[in-house]
Every structure is written in structure tokens, then in C-alpha cells.
């Protein structure tokens, strides 16, 4: 044995024997039986708690079901649908008018497809067929 590696090998051997004596566990107080008992008892408590909550929710749901099944007049639903359609149509028109100035429009008959703003605030039509008088 090399004198430099002998202490490290001895330390590893002692550590191995210590862990082998404990059954591979790092803590001497823990045992396989007690750890599994604690885990199963904790899981069992959680399971019982969740089952209790589930049964409470089911009781609440069954008590609320008769209230939800009450028939409503179809006229009320139709008037609501018409009102929402009117609101949606109005909203579409507002959005269309708001977006309209942003999009370039073609001027009919002139062939224009947009406008150009110069740095000095003068504007000109792009692609416009304009007859100029001399």
C-alpha cells in the first residue's frame, strides 16, 4: 500500500462499514418500518381529508341541482340574444370606423392607393393620375 493513499482508503473502508451496519441508511434513528409507517399514515390522513371534502361538495351540488333546473321562458333568452347581437353589431361598426382612417383607401377612378406625408407636412398622393395644367 502506498503511504499517501492509505489514510483515504482506510477512511473509505470505515465509512463503508458504518453504512453497511446501518443497513444503507444515512441516519441511525431511521428504520425502514418507521419511515414507511409515517408516510402511509400521512397519506392516509390526506386521503381521508380529501374524501371528506369531496363528500361535502357532492352534498352541496345535489342540493343546488333543483335550483339550476328551473325552466326559464324562451322569450327572455331570445331577447338577450337579440340585445347581444345588437351590441356586437354596434361594436363592429365602431371598430370599422376607428380602423378606417388608418388603412389606405383607393380613390375611385384616380388610381390612388395611398398618401405620402413629407417632413415638411406637405402631402401627396401615391400613384394618383392627376392632370396638371401648365
From Swiss-Prot:
Glycans are attached at residues 41, 62-63, 70, 74, 79, 84, 97. InterPro entries: Natr_peptide (IPR000663), Natr_peptide_CS (IPR030480), Natriuretic_peptide (IPR050787), Natriuretic_peptide_brain (IPR002408). It comes from the Eukaryota. Keywords: Disulfide bond, Glycoprotein, Hormone, Pharmaceutical, Proteoglycan, Secreted, Signal, Vasoactive, Vasodilator. Disulfide bonds join 112-128. The record marks 99-100, 102-106 as: Cleavage. One of its GO terms (cellular component) is extracellular region. SMART domains: NAT_PEP (SM00183). Changing residue 97 to A: Prevents O-glycosylation at this residue. Decreased extracellular levels of NPPB due to decreased stability after secretion whereas extracellular levels of brain natriuretic peptide 32 is increased. This is Natriuretic peptides B. The lineage of its organism: Eukaryota, Metazoa, Chordata, Craniata, Vertebrata.
